[in-house]
Amino acid sequence: ELYNVVDSFDTHARIPEHFEAVDKAAKESGHIGLISVGWDPGMFSLNRLYANAILPGGKDYTFWGKGVSQGHSDAIRRIAGVKDARQYTIPVESALEAVRSGSEPELTTRQKHTRECFVVAEEGADLKKIEEEIVTMPNYFADYDTTVHFISEEELLRDHAGIPHGGFVIRTGKTGWNNENSHVIEYSLKLDSNPEFTSSVLAAYARAAYRLRKEGQTGCKTVFDIAPAYLAAEDGAYLRKHML
């Protein structure tokens, strides 16, 4: 209501609801709101849209990692007897290769990703009980093959201090009178610092918010509504000469 905003709201199922609320407030107050800006949702969303538009007959796949899942790490930390933890989401390489082959496999959650947990337990804690709570936790670990390692606090700080992440968005499709030609569109990210990369995306979209507001636009927008030129620091002439 008071400012132009750019956010990284990332609960996919609630984005339509969030959009409606921000759109109403922004239009009533004469501001711009750019929501769900980051890499997923965000950069991955854009690549899904482009790939679906180009290959309407096809199949989408998203793989996350290898990287630290902050939400899953927090879920482990809430278990009694856990002092600290890091959880890595890891794509299953054989699943990735099957998708890249263009065979359009049907993959379950368990077949696409594994989860690896590094846990620092409180002194005297029941390690078996902690491990059982982790691997059976609904919505987080129960649907995955999950490995739990108990390590020292020193090892955690030495080997798992960063917040890397990344992933792959892949669409496979066919063209031709008899669907005889297969195509694979793949976009990938490998990030040493998830927060730093996400903030870089937010900064680019802040430029767009500024430009849109200068044009007199109001209301809520997503990455789907923003032309690429609005993100760049350079003007259109530079982009056409050097990047087109």
Task: Describe each PLM feature range.
Residues 183-244:
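NAD(P)-dependent Rossmann-like dehydrogenase/reductase catalytic/cofactor-binding core
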Residues 52-54, 59-63, 116-121:
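Short beta-strand and adjoining strand-loop segment in the mid-core
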